[in-house]
Amino acid sequence: MTKKEVGHNFLARLGKKRLRPGGITATNWLIEQGQFSKDSHVLEVACNMCTTSIELAQTYGCSVEGVDRDPKALEKARANICEAGLDELVHVQQANAMKLPFPDDSFDIIINEAMLTMLGDEAKIKAIKEYLRVLKPGGRLLTHDVSFTEERMGEQLASLRQTINANVEPLHVANWQKLFEEQGFSSVKLNYGKMTLMSIPGMIKDEGFWGNAENHLQRFEKRKSSAISKNVPFL
């Protein structure tokens, strides 16, 4: 991994498809809350290479719009969509979560994983307000981010930032709930568990055994900071 390369980009170069803090366990829990069907119109914000969007379309036959700011990730996403034969159901475009290119009341469900944590306080509010704007009345927001369960986590936060080489801004579990409720969301349901994104067991659970990538992952494991071993939870 280069000095300035963000951790999840490094993992993507090694072939990792699930770039989420709580891995497939957290994503599956979110999807269970979504009540997806073939009639659902879904938006995935920060879709990356569209692993989740593709699985949703394959499983439920729903239509999915994906947005991401990274043109390289979107290039991979388009290739993955084409390979899966889902060009009619899954579409992607470059866009900013704080200024979504969709009309009001467009979507039944929004899924957003591992992005709000990357934003500062004001940007979080702007993004969440945009989600509320483009959701239909009664729509659902499914979000998967990093949270803390203890009040004082300054040292662990510094270690986490160093580990993934990004200035992340996770919140306490209670503060995440307060943030969503203050922006107009109701019936906020929370779940949290261990952060598995950059652990070898988590990678194996998410992706299976990787063959040629295994040695690279073992070398990366040695570089981890203590933040990962402290079980920083996901929201």
Where in the sequence are the language-model features?
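A short acidic, Gly/Pro-enriched loop at the edge of an enzyme's catalytic core
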Residues: 98-110
